[in-house]
Amino acid sequence: IAEALRTKYSIAHNHTGANLFSGIAAALGANPNAEVAVLEVDELVLPWAIEKTKPELVVLLNLGRDQLDRLSEVRIVSNKWRDALGGQRVLASTDDPFVVYAANNAAEQIWFSASEKGHMDAATCPQCGQLLNWEDDGANFWCQCGFKKPNANWVLNGETLNNEFKVNSSIPGAAAKQNAARAFIVANEFGVDLEAANQAIGNVKAVDGRFAEKIIGQTNFRLLLSKNPASWRETLATSKLGPKKVLLVVNANTQDGKDTSWLWDVDFTPLSGREVLVTGERKIDVSARLTVEGIDHKVVADERIAANIFGASDADIIASYTAFHRLANK
């Protein structure tokens, strides 16, 4: 979004991913005369950020289970968002019942669909608590109380928006394509030349170190960040199309979430048939999970040992938050 809008405006942006109070304040303070501020905001910080910045547009991504010891359940976060969005203009996903419930309270909605199916936490209606009805193989949802999936203003099919605009994305994975599409829609809302915006979006090769390359020993690693079951599902699907060798690095610090029970919500079967190494502060937890899944793997002390084992080859590192940023800044 920042790069798309930068083609027309001067931008203040927390480009390092520092999305809590201090990071937002630092981004605004670093460029106080910017014409537009593009701020990535933590789930719990969103109500505060809306109150303090009075945004012209709030872009809501999907809302999944993440750091339950810090964020609480998805429904609680959705309710907090709903309370904060009164009077706001939002770009929101129609595919996520919790986002729809929150965005329904906004003054104006721009609905976006990537035709995603189902939601691992949405068995019941966020509005009334009754069982949510899922139809069309998970593509649509509705409830007897009247809550339902809204019609989308923008629909992404593959790389094409509304069967008209092909969106550029140089970052692999379905989530990256969806974010590129959202950036395109935001550029349209802010009156940016769409051809210039689309080119700028396509020029983004890595975001805050994600998908950046890091050479350790003789191994060329690609860095992938995964923080919760939803992001692990997406990352594992993306990684499956890449190198056969993969290193998993999982910590459990405050920024990661100290509760690692989420590992049991992740389907690790995409790792089958690959050379898998495991390290990090919670490597034993990960090893236990992979053993139950039947995934062959080895536990190693750190990424240097992993590089010695992998040798001169390409490999992926899939890392939790603190491990990822340590490696990205190494």
Predicted regions and their residues:
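Phosphate-binding loop of NTP-binding sites
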Residues: 1-111, 120
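Buried hydrophobic packing segments
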Residues: 5, 24-28, 180-190, 235
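Short glycine-/acidic-enriched loop or helix-start segments at secondary-structure transitions
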Residues: 23, 48-49, 69-70, 100-103, ...
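Active-site flanking residues adjacent to catalytic metal/cofactor-binding acidic residues
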Residues: 39, 92-94, 178, 223, ...
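Residue-level signal for inorganic ion chemistry
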Residues: 40, 61, 91, 179, ...
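Generic beta-sheet signal
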Residues: 60-61, 93, 112-114, 249, ...
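Acidic, Mg2+-coordinating active-site environments of NTP-dependent enzymes
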Residues: 64-219, 296
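ATP-dependent carboxylate-amine ligase
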Residues: 126-129, 140-147, 188-192, 199-208, ...
